[in-house]
Amino acid sequence: VQYIVVKIGNEQYGIDIKYIDNIVRSQNITRVPKTQPYYKGVINLRGEICPIMSMRLKLGLEPDELTDKTRFIIVKVEGASIGVIVDQVKEVVTLEEEDIERISRSTNDDAAANYINAIGKKDGELISLLDIVSLIVENN
């Protein structure tokens, strides 16, 4: 399975490539009033309105600082597109089944743990594999 490895805060996360529609540089976000704090607003993506979500806030981390490495990853889930803000896109990795260790849902208070469904091992590094569907569909 191929994953895009991204950096969010100090951690590396993997997003299954089958959900990724596009990766774009950060751009102006139009705020939308009365929405969840992690919902940053919308952008105009080739004439389409695309909502943007802060992965940092959703995962219980410090608010985003947009830099020249910041990217919006446009994911398509259940027919809808949504952009997620990541601090950096690192690489594409291919993980074999034996490189992936499934983990059960956490019952602790760590927000990030609720959205990680496996840990991938690549060249001695650990990559938390995000359950991007539950991350986006929940509460939206």
Question: What are these regions, as identified by a protein language model?
Answer:
Residues 1-140:
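An acidic, low-aromatic, low-complexity terminal/linker signal
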